[in-house]
């Protein structure tokens, strides 16, 4: 998929392994992986951070191949899912940081322009999540109250 506010086509991506079976050297069972997800989710880690942690320290390349479910679905079943989707959360966090920067540096025209681009991404993503019923239909992003969402 192409980029929204850049000329790049976004072709590079990581390749999933061809074999979808669990490697023979992996000693963790599906229940062990779910238990690790529960522990890491309790600490407040996001699904992508949990995936990186499981990959790097436990050797689980793809949680979905081991458990049959994605990390976020497992977290939802355990009641640990975040109220905001992860990509939207990080975009809002970026917009809040840019807003703080603009309060200190009023004449930074480029940052002001980039903030507009980030906020338009937030609005587009929010519209998508409203159609998918992930966000309530009356949810609205406002830059004045955004810092409370990511705090």
UniProtKB/Swiss-Prot annotation:
Gene3D superfamilies: 4.10.860.130, S15/NS1, RNA-binding (1.10.287.10)
NCBIfam families: PRK08561.1 (NF006331)
Keywords per UniProt: Ribonucleoprotein, Ribosomal protein
Similarity field: Belongs to the universal ribosomal protein uS15 family.
One of the record's GO molecular function terms: small ribosomal subunit rRNA binding
SUPFAM superfamilies registered for this protein in UniProt: S15/NS1 RNA-binding domain
Nucleotide-binding as UniProt keyword: no
GO BP term, example: translation
Gene Ontology CC entries for this record: cytosolic small ribosomal subunit; nucleolus
Entry protein name: Small ribosomal subunit protein uS15
Keyword Ribosomal protein annotated: yes
Matches recorded under InterPro entries: Ribosomal_uS15, Ribosomal_uS15_arc_euk, Ribosomal_uS15_N, uS15_NS1_RNA-bd_sf
């Amino acid at each position: 998929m192409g980029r929204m506010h850049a000329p790049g086509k976004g072709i590079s991506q990581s390749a999933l392994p061809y074999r979808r079976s669990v490697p023979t050297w992996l000693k963790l069972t599906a229940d062990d992986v779910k238990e690790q997800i529960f522990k890491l989710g309790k600490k407040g880690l996001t699904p992508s951070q949990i995936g990186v942690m499981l990959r790097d320290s436990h050797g689980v390349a793809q949680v979905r191949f081991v458990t049959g479910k994605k990390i976020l679905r497992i977290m939802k079943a355990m009641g640990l899912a975040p109220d905001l989707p992860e990509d939207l959360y990080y975009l809002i966090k970026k917009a809040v940081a840019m807003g703080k920067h603009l309060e200190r540096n009023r004449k930074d025209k480029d940052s002001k322009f980039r903030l507009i681009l980030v906020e338009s991404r937030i609005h587009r993503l929010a519209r998508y999540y409203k159609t998918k019923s992930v966000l309530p239909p009356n949810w609205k992003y406002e830059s004045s109250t955004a810092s409370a969402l990511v705090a």
